[in-house]
């Protein structure tokens, strides 16, 4: 039975409610029945998994029937009221989209609106009891402060046994504890109960049970174990059993969802004739090498669609994108649940899903939305095998992009890195633990060439989210007792799981600037921006202009022309310019702000405003083999919110020395007709080329994803006209489609597939 905790209104609460009702007058006819029912004894409980005793899905019993609350319009104020109904002092947070699993039965309340001062949930506005257009995929939950209300009566808790739940699962190696490489893939199953760790009786244990346990531990699949060996070993050891009768279907994301039984305190004969349950898990490709197992070559069927995660700070989390007709697209969050999320996680080589995310929690995608209303049983090998609805334009928007957080194997990587000297746990000087001859020791990292990509890996290894800044100097932070530099020349691609996977100098430490003043530091953040260029607009607005030199003095002053313009016969003649508009969207979860402070912004007389970034975008003309033949020379940029999505307000503007940046949900538009919004192609010969635009090319400002910062188009130039087509974000196509793009022979069709 699932763990629940139940409280009922105390007689004093009932008396207080009646007194308040007499003071305030009779309730209106439309809300009267609900308040009356509440005053006569609503019951509340927390349910779901995995959870602690002070958090969970909120369930209310009314007229003898249990039901849930929809998350529409749910706020922290409503959570405060519900936590007090449950006997806690206040709420510290709330959850949506059935984070603790979907409930059953009625959905009692929808559009619940509380001010936070109400004495009861019945005093909050809502659509009325039982009036809802939600599904249980939208069940709300609360996270209460672990502090009880003084004098609150909790004598109506159902039974003590119902508080029992499997809080955590681990594998304990039967032999060689502490000597095996991480992650541990085989051993005895142990579950953490309120009174400590216990083993599980293996009577009736099945492969389905192992599948669920391995999924919780971050492994996509399981394999058979040497039962005879473990049976012999069990006879020589003492055991502490706390759980038996486990019967999983195999699709559960958590052991708490399986049918299981807890031993009672007075049970003396535990697991008669049985032994401790044992599992052997198969790690995914990312973790196979570190666990000492060889990577298994998993052959995919011909034509099988692929899946990827984008925008996540950690491995195994992100926005779900699937490949259809050689183009990547997102998944609508309608009907999105843990079963579908677990299929994605296992397909990618991780365990089951820890969380099914909705509402573009991992940022919005751009382009196609391929799937909607995905309904998986949990047994499918690919998301495309699940029943789903063909998407139409009016069905979904990118504000509903689905995401996942997967269970990952424990590797201990976070124990080999730490921060010191910072003002908070999210910032500080980076210290790493290294081995070698002698004992393990902590040391610093040389700040030379340390940047955003290296900081991304450090923050990921620390478990602190995204990188906000990578710092080459840390003299302004408190100095610690660690002074030795043990790592230098660190160069990361940004995708590594830990710093020791990045290229570095090894044991030969080379640091140009010595001393702890110039060691590497980071500032991490839970959110980050994500910039994308609207590629279709580039294709629609591209054209050639022969602009007279006497109109280009300001552009020449800002170095926006090719070098050959210096020897031109000014003010006579002209320059041939490829002009286009660029619309840069921030689809992340944090505003994009320039790295430089206001004190260092540069005034540009030609434009009449300050520029906050020297290098924000590169414009290039490339040959098919990647050789650059022309480039845009825009000296610097001003960042502002030109337009925003509905219900998003502009925050940044260039005029009047305003704050600069791009708000989440807004975009900065550089129109084709402004100075320097071009590439000087005067010296380019006729032929087939690639137009490339790269945003934030030097990674000066941190983002959640840099792989979508480049846009490419095919160009055919005949010396008089130019055709620009096939414009797309750099990672929007499959690898095969991108290879065909690079081999572009010069056709004028807009289709490359």
UniProtKB/Swiss-Prot annotation:
Effect of residue 376 to A: Impaired ability to mediate deacetylation of STAT3
The record's account of how the chain is modified after translation: The lysine tyrosylquinone cross-link (LTQ) is generated by condensation of the epsilon-amino group of a lysine with a topaquinone produced by oxidation of tyrosine.
Taxonomic superkingdom: Eukaryota
Keywords per UniProt: Copper, Cytoplasm, Deafness, Disulfide bond, Glycoprotein, Inflammatory response, LTQ, Metal-binding, Nucleus, Oxidoreductase, Repeat, Secreted, Signal, Stickler syndrome, TPQ
GO term, biological process aspect, one: negative regulation of T-helper 17 cell lineage commitment
Amino acids binding Cu cation: 607, 609, 611
Required cofactor(s): Cu cation; lysine tyrosylquinone residue
Cofactor note: Contains 1 lysine tyrosylquinone.
Reactions the enzyme catalyzes: L-lysyl-[protein] + O2 + H2O = (S)-2-amino-6-oxohexanoyl-[protein] + H2O2 + NH4(+); N(6)-acetyl-L-lysyl-[protein] + O2 + H2O = acetamide + (S)-2-amino-6-oxohexanoyl-[protein] + H2O2
EC annotation from Swiss-Prot or TrEMBL: 1.4.3.-, 1.4.3.13
UniProt region (Disordered), positions on chain: 290-315
Residues carrying covalently attached carbohydrate according to the record: 111, 266, 390, 481, 625
Alphabetical list of SMART domains matching this protein: SR (SM00202)
Disulfide bonds: 70-134, 83-144, 114-124, 201-271, 214-281, 248-258, 332-396, 345-406, 376-386, 446-511, 459-524, 492-502, 554-560, 606-654, 638-644, 666-676, 713-727
PTM sites of type 2',4',5'-topaquinone: 670
GO terms for MF: copper ion binding; fibronectin binding; protein-lysine 6-oxidase activity
Record cross-link Lysine tyrosylquinone (Lys-Tyr), residues: 634-670
Subcellular location: Secreted, Extracellular space; Cytoplasm; Nucleus
Signal peptide (UniProt feature, chain positions): 1-25
Function: Protein-lysine 6-oxidase that mediates the oxidation of peptidyl lysine residues to allysine in target proteins. Catalyzes the post-translational oxidative deamination of peptidyl lysine residues in precursors of elastin and different types of collagens, a prerequisite in the formation of cross-links between collagens and elastin. Required for somite boundary formation by catalyzing oxidation of fibronectin (FN1), enhancing integrin signaling in myofibers and their adhesion to the myotendinous junction (MTJ).
Database matches in PANTHER family: LYSYL OXIDASE HOMOLOG 3 (PTHR45817:SF2), LYSYL OXIDASE-LIKE-RELATED (PTHR45817)
Disease per record: Defects in LOXL3 are found in a family with an autosomal recessive form of Stickler syndrome, an inherited disorder that associates ocular signs with more or less complete forms of Pierre Robin sequence and sensorineural deafness. Pierre Robin sequence includes an opening in the roof of the mouth (a cleft palate). The degree of hearing loss varies among affected individuals and may become more severe over time. Syndrome expressivity is variable. Ocular disorders include non-progressive myopia with associated chorioretinal degeneration.
Name of the molecule in the record: Lysyl oxidase homolog 3
Organism expressing this protein natively: Homo sapiens (Human)
GN (gene name): LOXL3
């Amino acid at each position: 039975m699932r763990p629940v905790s139940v409280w009922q209104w105390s007689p004093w609460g009932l008396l207080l409610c009646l007194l308040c009702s007499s003071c305030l007058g009779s309730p209106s006819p439309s809300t009267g029945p609900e308040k009356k029912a509440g005053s006569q004894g609503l019951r509340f409980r927390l349910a779901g998994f995995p959870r602690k005793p002070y958090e969970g899905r909120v369930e209310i019993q009314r007229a003898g029937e249990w039901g849930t609350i929809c998350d529409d319009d749910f706020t922290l104020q409503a959570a405060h009221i519900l936590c007090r109904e449950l006997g806690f002092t206040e709420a510290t947070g709330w959850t949506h989209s059935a984070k603790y699993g979907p409930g059953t039965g009625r959905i009692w309340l929808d559009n619940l609106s509380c001010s936070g001062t109400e004495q009861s949930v019945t005093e909050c506005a809502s659509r009325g009891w039982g009036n809802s257009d939600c599904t249980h995929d939208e069940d709300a939950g609360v996270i209460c402060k672990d502090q009880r209300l003084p004098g609150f009566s909790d004598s109506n808790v159902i039974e003590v046994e119902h508080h029992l739940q499997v809080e955590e699962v681990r594998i304990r190696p039967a032999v060689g504890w502490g000597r095996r490489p991480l992650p541990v893939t085989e051993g005895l199953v142990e579950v953490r109960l309120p009174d400590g760790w216990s083993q599980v009786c293996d009577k009736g244990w099945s492969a389905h049970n192992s599948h669920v346990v391995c999924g919780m531990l971050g492994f996509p699949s399981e394999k058979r174990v040497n039962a005879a060996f473990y049976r012999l070993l069990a006879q020589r050891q003492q055991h502490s059993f706390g759980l038996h009768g486990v019967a999983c279907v195999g699709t559960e994301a958590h052991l708490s969802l399986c049918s299981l039984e807890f031993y009672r305190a007075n049970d003396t004969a535990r697991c008669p004739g049985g032994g401790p349950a044992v599992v052997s898990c198969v790690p995914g490709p990312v973790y196979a090498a570190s666990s000492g197992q060889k990577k298994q070559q998993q052959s995919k069927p011909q034509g099988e669609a692929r899946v990827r995660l984008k925008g996540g700070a950690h491995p195994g989390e992100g926005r779900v994108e699937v490949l259809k007709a050689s183009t990547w697209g997102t998944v609508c969050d309608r009907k999105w649940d843990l079963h579908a999320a677990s299929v994605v996680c296992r397909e990618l080589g991780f365990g089951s899903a820890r969380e099914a995310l909705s509402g573009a929690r991992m940022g919005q995608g751009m382009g196609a939305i391929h799937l909607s209303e995905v309904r998986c049983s949990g047994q499918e090998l690919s998301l495309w095998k699940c029943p789903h609805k063909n998407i139409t334009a009016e069905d979904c928007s990118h504000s509903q992009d689905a995401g996942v957080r997967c269970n990952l194997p424990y590797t201990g990587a976070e124990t080999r890195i730490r921060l010191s000297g910072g003002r908070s746990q999210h910032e500080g000087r980076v210290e790493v633990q290294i081995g070698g001859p002698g004992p393990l020791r902590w040391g610093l990292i040389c700040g030379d060439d340390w940047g955003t990509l290296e900081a991304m890996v450090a923050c990921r290894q620390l478990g602190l989210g995204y990188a906000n800044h990578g710092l080459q100097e840390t003299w302004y932070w408190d100095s610690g007792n660690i002074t030795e530099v043990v790592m230098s020349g660190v160069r990361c691609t940004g995708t590594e799981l830990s710093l020791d996977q990045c290229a570095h100098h090894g044991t030969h430490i080379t640091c140009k600037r010595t001393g702890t003043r110039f060691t590497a530091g980071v500032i991490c953040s839970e959110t980050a921006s994500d910039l994308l260029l609207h590629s279709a607009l580039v294709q629609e607005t591209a054209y050639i202009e022969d602009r007279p030199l006497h109109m280009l003095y300001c552009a020449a002053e800002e170095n926006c022309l090719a070098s050959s313009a210096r020897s031109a016969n000014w003010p006579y003649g002209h320059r041939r310019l490829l002009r286009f508009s660029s619309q840069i969207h921030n689809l992340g979860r944090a505003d994009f702000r320039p790295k430089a402070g206001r004190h260092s912004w540069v005034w540009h007389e030609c434009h009449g405003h300050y520029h906050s970034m020297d290098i924000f975008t590169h414009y290039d003309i490339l040959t098919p083999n990647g050789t650059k033949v022309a480039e845009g020379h825009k000296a610097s940029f001003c960042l502002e919110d030109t337009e925003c999505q509905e219900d998003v307000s502009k925050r940044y503007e260039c005029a009047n020395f305003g704050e600069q940046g791009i708000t989440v949900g807004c975009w900065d538009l550089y129109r084709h007709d402004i100075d320097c919004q071009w590439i000087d192609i005067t010296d380019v010969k006729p032929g087939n080329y690639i137009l490339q635009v790269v945003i934030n090319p030097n990674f000066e400002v941190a983002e959640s994803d840099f792989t979508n910062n480049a846009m490419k188009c095919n160009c055919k130039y005949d010396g008089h006209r130019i055709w620009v087509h096939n414009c797309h974000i750099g990672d929007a196509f499959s690898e095969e489609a991108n290879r065909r793009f690079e081999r572009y022979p010069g056709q004028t069709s807009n289709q490359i597939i």
